[in-house]
Amino acid sequence: MSNNINANNLNTDSSSSPVNVPKMDALIIPVTMEVPCDSRGQRMWWAFLASSMVTFFGGLFIILLWRTLKYLWTVCCHCGVKNKEAQKINGGGDTQADGACKPTDEKEENVAAEVGWMTSVKDWAGVMISAQTLTGRVLVVLVFALSIGALVIYFIDSSNPIESCQNFYKDFTLQIDMAFNVFFLLYFGLRFIAANDKLWFWLEVNSVVDFFTVPPVFVSVYLNRSWLGLRFLRALRLIQFSEILQFLNILKTSNSIKLVNLCSIFISTWLTAAGFIHLVENSGDPWENFQNNQQLTYWECVYLLMVTMSTVGYGDVYAKTTLGRLFMVFFILGGLAMFASYVPEIIELIGNRKKYGGSYSAVSGRKHIVVCGHITLESVSNFLKDFLHKDRDDVNVEIVFLHNISPNLELEALFKRHFTQVEFYQGSVLNPHDLARVKIESADACLILANKYCADPDAEDASNIMRVISIKNYHPKIRIITQMLQYHNKAHLLNIPSWNWKEGDDAICLAELKLGFIAQSCLAPGLSTMLANLFSMRSFIKIEEDTWQKYYLEGVANEMYTEYLSSAFVGLSFPAVCELVFAKLKLLMIAIEYKSEKRESSILINPGNHVKIQEGTLGFFIASDAKEVKRAFFYCKACHDDITDPKRIKKCGCKRLEDEQPSTLSPKKKQRNGGMRNSPNSSPKLMRHDPLLIPGNEQIDNMDANVKKYDSTGMFHWCPAKDIEKVILTRSEAAMTVLSGHVVVCIFGDVKSALIGLRNLVMPLRASNFHYHELKHIVFVGSLEYLRREWETLHNFPKVSILPGTPLSRADLRAVNINLCDMCVILSANQNNIDDASLQDKECILASLNIKSMQFDDSIGVLQANSQGFTPPGMDRSSPDNSPVHGLLRQPSITTGANIPIITELVNDSNVQFLDQDDDDDPDTELYLTQPFACGTAFAVSVLDSLMSATYFNDNILTLIRTLVTGGATPELEALIAEENALRGGYSTPQTLANRDRCRVAQLALYDGPFADLGDGGCYGDLFCKALKTYNMLCFGIYRLRDAHLSTPSQCTKRYVITNPPYEFELVPTDLIFCLMQFDHNAGQSRASLSHSSHSSYSSSKKSSSVHSIPSTANRPNRTKTRDSREKQKYVQEDRL
């Protein structure tokens, strides 16, 4: 574009020209024919520039002059006031100042009126431009938008010559620009009025932009010509872009604000500098009479500035004018510094922008859950493996993970593999904004994972409790399932007003369940493995070889499920339904949800014949997958009575009561598949029998109302608090004490160790469904300083002793007769602050290997076996019932530590490889596939991870598991413990004694007794039916010798667990049968009833035959006196301990 165009057909009458142009030597410029311009084509750029300079410097001069006069006036006035005060002091205060000064009162009134008027106007202007009000925000945003509009007009006009003749009434862009600048002028006035410091306001960037852009527009209208000039300065308004976005509440985070700030400063500087180069290069140098100009578009200048800032400098575009080159020299210094600092920081902010920001978009017809807390590769993979297991049918639930740390590459890859059902968002549940992002208000549940390996369990629990508080505060109705490490921290959850276990909120206490599982293994070895496998989803692994792994893995494939019973079972007793379901449907039902006359739900585990199946009864089944359990719901006596193949039992065409009442069954029926849980009214509150089932008359008659033997709930044995000094045994005292059939608990802990929570280990062993003489003595071996810290929770339990020492000392172990114990428990030291994971269990592994390598003199066991105190519970040596017929004949004692029953707690699963030296387990083998775990001699807290998903799909499963392993702990009892941190004793009443009438887990020997005929090649299904019909015992598994399948005899005494064997499974004489046995009211008077015997009877191959005896009514009256005399001797001995 050229500034030299020939002018033709112009009006030469100077009087008709709109402007009287002074005569001066100037370059003739071309103009359009349509616009009446100066006939001589004189440049008028100086007029536009002068308008801005005069405005700027004139205003600056006025402000400085006003400040100077104000300063002089203030100084003079101040001097006059001083003289006046001096005169008042000298003249007594009656004289007046000179006549030039007004009276004081009148002057003060005028100043106050003046200040009040100015202040009100100033405040009004401040409100108008303030972003704190709606009007101010609208005005600020409008000014910014119009500034960008003016900049766009500049971009459009930059394609025209720098100076051209344009008619204001015909040029549309000039009219729009004029309107914009009128608005800018008004806004400038408001800003000027509201400014506290007028001088700084006059010098700030936005004011300078207005000075050099607004006045030239009015000059353009007057001269009928346009000059691009300094209109590019409007680009500096982009610096305020971040402020505008903050006013609109779009930018909220510091990183986003910083990013927008850097980008806006960089772009505005870039565009402004490009505008200056465009101006000088297209105009030329004034001292060269504008002859050295070059034609550059604005965007070519933008390109030139970019290659200059980046130090590339291709040379294809460069500055020719002196002004342009001089500007480039200084711009390179500043531009290069800005480019080198701003661009990397911008890239870093963009690169660090949260990849997992955004918000969750709910899918119609699909529920979602939020998982938070301890999110790592291990915890997430374990959770997903169980939650998305194929045996759960189609899980139509999306999993949303929320964590404040972005996932590493391995975890990110895991999320990508499950991208159809898993999403990850970076954030914190403590932030309500992040909770809104994951749509917590519409989530079906929120699951909180805990770090099981943290160094400070109390701190981890506190973090999870705060997460619960935050989530419940945001949405009180959300269902929360959280993991807790310490039992005593569960009490804090009860303080949250919206926490309601009846609505589905659950706290899975890992210490409570872990120690409960171990405690049950003291009563029925191997039970911890069986229960852990039942609530964990495992795929079936088929092995053709006839090895112990084949039978173990067949049982591992079983899980716990719930399903509603068909109306065909209504009216039948629980044992009758159990037998029918097992024999015909190939299912094992162990419990039901029972509604009392008050419509209160309770879960009954193996109730007796008195419980009849109601309509809509929920059954708890052990099966290999959810499809098999549906047979219990589809079963129809008319259609399926003659079917022998259970796979053919499917929904029939009969009109069923369930179909007539869909509102009763349908809402709950699908809880397995989609997580639909029971309604609040159906949440079971207790796992005990009907309250009407009170003890028999004999038990009530023998009840001593003045003695507190049980806690206030009647669920546990209780005794008055004992001082710890009274239960401490020295090594010599322990050696002199007759200890047999007891439980030795080895503890590695010191005064600084985190508390294990030994109460959770002792409570199941002190459940009230055991008679007092059946309770196993518990001996703790460990640091006295640590045990003192735990004693406050243990001092109300009977038959507890402490031997200060170390489990690594063989002398301490011999002192407690470890070779005669029923179980040796080795608990982890909780040393989770060790970097090497393999060393976390070093004490437990060393203690286990130390015990297994010990040798014992058989004569000691024989001598002690001849003493009365060695008599195992459930056997009377003076009774004729003590015969091989009942399987309680005492065998020679253990001579090697390898035969001592041990269960070892491990922190790190991989350390299980060090426990058994004769196994061939690979270090990468999963825990449940290893020999120590299959045999029930090792337990790790990691197996409890599966309870999170199991509880979500069915909260009754957690209630069932908790009752089985804790001995009967209920929410009411937890509230009581939270109040006092100790069990409270209570008097025996028919109501509390009724709570003793509940099932317990035991083991049944097949070597002799009523089932001896089935032990040698018999059928497991026949044993199941016989035990159920005769003794109301519900069998659910086998504890078999590891080498029982071999044709040649083996000296190995290790056993493994077989869960829910099929009906035709062949039995061997050495098998021990897991069973749920009823509470025997008469066992308190006669110890020849079916009771749990000392498990030292199976700890060696010679003693594997006797665990339980079968009730015998013969000679019962004759044995009562003998038992009473022996009980007196034992009570005296217990007091001494």
From Swiss-Prot:
GO CC terms: monoatomic ion channel complex; postsynaptic membrane
Extracellular side: 1-44, 159-173, 220-223, 281-294, 318-326
Annotated stretches, region: Segment S9: 738-758
Membrane-related topology note: Multi-pass membrane protein
Transmembrane segment boundaries: 45-65, 138-158, 174-194, 199-219, 224-244, 260-280, 327-347
Highest taxon of the lineage: Eukaryota
Annotated source species: Gallus gallus
Residue stretches making up the RCK N-terminal domain: 366-508, 740-884
Protein name listed in UniProt: Calcium-activated potassium channel subunit alpha-1
Extent of Low complexity compositional bias: 1088-1112
Compositional bias (Basic and acidic residues): 1121-1137
Subcellular location: Cell membrane
Misc: The protein was initially thought to contain two functionally distinct parts: The core channel (from the N-terminus to the S9 segment) that mediates the channel activity, and the cytoplasmic tail (from the S9 segment to the C-terminus) that mediates the calcium sensing. The situation is however more complex, since the core channel contains binding sites for Ca(2+) and Mg(2+).
Domain comment quoted from the record: The S0 segment is essential for the modulation by the accessory beta subunits.
Region of interest called Heme-binding motif, as start-end residue ranges on this chain: 636-640
Positions occupied by motif Selectivity for potassium: 311-314
Intramembrane segments: 295-317
General function of this protein: Potassium channel activated by both membrane depolarization or increase in cytosolic Ca(2+) that mediates export of K(+). It is also activated by the concentration of cytosolic Mg(2+). Its activation dampens the excitatory events that elevate the cytosolic Ca(2+) concentration and/or depolarize the cell membrane. It therefore contributes to repolarization of the membrane potential.
Keywords of this entry: Calcium, Cell membrane, Ion channel, Ion transport, Magnesium, Membrane, Metal-binding, Potassium, Potassium channel, Potassium transport, Transmembrane, Transmembrane helix, Transport, Voltage-gated channel
Family matches, as InterPro entries: Ion_trans_dom, K_chnl_BK_asu, K_chnl_Slo-like, NAD(P)-bd_dom_sf, RCK_N, Slowpoke-like_C
Segments for region (Segment S10): 933-953
Span of the annotated motif Calcium bowl: 904-926
